[in-house]
């Protein structure tokens, strides 16, 4: 159609302020759920019908290391990233041939979000531009054979 993407990078995410689950304010918890799960679903619904129509495309839903493990004081974030893993794998089972959906753990990247959790220790991790040099070729190589696989940028 000319307007149908080959790849959708679905990277909506917020993280809660570090706190035990019972101390995370209800509104903050809801906002993390709304952005990290519902936001991802809205993007999928916006692009997937056109991709199905043309019979090709890859949806990359960004997960996290915390979508496959957990850590104290970020329970809401962990819960949403585990949800992205399951949501994406279920979506992959629903897709017609020629399409793919993958949950992608980008690895640890020096971002403001990471700084909110790790403080000055975040600076020991790669900058986004350094990460992109490795990730872009990896992501561009994704295709139908990767459908449903939990992948990581290493």
Question: Over which residues does each language-model region extend?
Answer:
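Residue(s) in the substrate-gating loop at a strand-loop-helix junction
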Residues: 64
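Conserved NAD(P)H cofactor-binding loop of Rossmann-fold oxidoreductase domains
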Residues: 12-17
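Active-site-adjacent segment of SDR/Rossmann-fold oxidoreductases
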Residues: 69, 90-99
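Active-site loop-to-helix junction immediately N-terminal to the catalytic Tyr of the SDR YXXXK motif
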Residues: 24, 70-78, 90, 117
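Substrate-binding pocket helix/loop in short-chain dehydrogenase/reductase
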Residues: 19-21, 28-30
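Active-site helix of classical SDR
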Residues: 44, 80
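C-terminal helical subdomain
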Residues: 97-99, 103-104, 111, 120-154
